[in-house]
């Protein structure tokens, strides 16, 4: 109960801070550092979608909604060469924390590989797909997942548990120092750190130089 009270108080305090925080109204063109949830938001919006790490087959008719794709064939570099991305279907715990992505068989009856490399050292290696063949994913990877909110057994291409690994990553303190240095080199008086991207509830912090 005490932990619950602490969590509720922390949540309330954060809401008050957001309400009282000044709005950013001036134009800003300079370096920005993404941290915490902002990093995952950018990753999800750019990679965890159809036409990126999820295979996508363009419809035959123009009436269907268009999907923006990576337009990068397998074997091309799509991200920094220190980054590797893997998909795990059987990983049910990580550091003792239960995960929701583990499954033994997908919605179309296909048994997925336990581990699948999607990006290796920045190179686009493979994409997740269901039973509908596409140009770069002609076979199913066992990645058809039932929608949690669906009552009609609907499913779509989705991952198990995505693991992102960065070789020789930089510590947060050095990243902040690099941000300040870059802002000073551009003659700016401040820079921004973004820790959450959620519309009006986004958490953006100004760092005065």
Q: Where in the sequence are the language-model features?
A:
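N-terminal small-residue-enriched
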Residues: 1-209
